[in-house]
């Protein structure tokens, strides 16, 4: 579990110190909205694995914020540096995600990451860690709860309930599609609690996942390719 990545400078590779670092970085998370009402670029990120887990495969998709059409797709591959440890996903996946970010030709105004934001036992899921490291506004979109509790949201698309941990809200349980389990939506960095919900709703189409992470999930999991429209460079870009 040793790593030489500068993102984890000072980490000795132990689980105990990783959790301590999470608590320190969580204090740097900003939960105020820093996203324009009319952003131009969104990005979605997700991670998969190859070679029996020996290679981490990070997918990045850049989208037009107005049309939600993809503008760029990229894959970054790095050697997997540590095994899966519950609650420490970012220490396993962040190096590949940062390499995928570096492949984008333009900087996104808002990032969606498949994983937790602050809906995490130490309030530093991968979307929060990514946001603190990069300074980019981030939202975490997870398929399962990692921390806290919530009342089941109503059955209709858009129904939502707060996720609470120790009396404080850490995210939302959002019914993004009827007859599907709710998504776990939480701010990662430089996005408010309400902003995380609003932006997720704005980027939903006919599927359970919002478009940024849905497209990234297709690339990362190899379930399908993402086609960039020929000659399309973005709405008013």
Swiss-Prot record:
Gene3D superfamilies for this protein: archaeoglobus fulgidus dsm 4304 superfamily
One example GO MF annotation: deoxyribonuclease V activity
Any Gene Ontology biological process: DNA repair
Cofactor(s) the protein needs: Mg(2+)
InterPro entries listed in its UniProt record: Endonuclease-V (IPR007581)
Subcellular localization, as worded in the UniProt entry: Cytoplasm
Top class in the EC scheme: hydrolase
Residues where Mg(2+) binds: 46, 114
Residues marked Interaction with target DNA (site): 84
Pfam families, sorted: Endonuclease_5
Keywords assigned: Cytoplasm, DNA damage, DNA repair, Endonuclease, Hydrolase, Magnesium, Metal-binding, Nuclease
Any GO CC annotation of this UniProt entry: cytoplasm
Principal subcellular localisation of the protein: cytoplasm
E.C. numbers: 3.1.21.7
Catalytic activity: Endonucleolytic cleavage at apurinic or apyrimidinic sites to products with a 5'-phosphate
HAMAP family, sorted: Endonuclease_5
Described function: DNA repair enzyme involved in the repair of deaminated bases. Selectively cleaves double-stranded DNA at the second phosphodiester bond 3' to a deoxyinosine leaving behind the intact lesion on the nicked DNA.
Family that this chain belongs to: Belongs to the endonuclease V family.
Protein name: Endonuclease V
Natural source organism: Xanthomonas axonopodis pv. citri (strain 306)
Gene: nfi
């Amino acid at each position: 579990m040793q790593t030489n990545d500068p993102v984890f400078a000072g980490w000795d590779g132990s689980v105990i110190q990783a959790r301590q670092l999470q608590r320190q970085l969580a204090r740097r998370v900003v939960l105020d909205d820093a996203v324009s009402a009319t952003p131009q670029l969104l990005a979605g990120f997700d991670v998969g694995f190859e070679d029996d887990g020996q290679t981490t495969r990070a997918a990045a998709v850049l989208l037009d914020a107005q049309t939600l059409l993809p503008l760029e797709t990229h894959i970054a591959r790095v050697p997997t540096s540590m095994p899966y440890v519950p609650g420490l996903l970012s220490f396993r996946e962040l190096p590949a995600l940062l390499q995928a970010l570096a492949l984008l030709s333009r900087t996104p105004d808002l990032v969606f990451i498949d994983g937790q934001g602050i809906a995490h036992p130490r309030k530093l899921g991968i979307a929060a860690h990514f946001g603190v490291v990069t300074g980019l506004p981030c939202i975490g979109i997870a398929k399962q709860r990692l921390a806290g509790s919530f009342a089941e949201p109503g059955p209709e698309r858009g129904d939502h309930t707060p996720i609470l941990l120790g009396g404080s809200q850490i995210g939302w349980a959002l019914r993004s599609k009827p007859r599907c389990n709710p998504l776990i939506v939480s701010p990662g960095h430089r996005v408010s609690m309400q902003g995380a919900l609003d932006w997720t709703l704005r980027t939903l189409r006919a599927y359970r996942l919002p478009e940024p992470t849905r497209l990234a999930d297709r690339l990362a999991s190899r379930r399908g390719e993402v086609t960039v429209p020929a000659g399309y460079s973005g709405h008013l870009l």
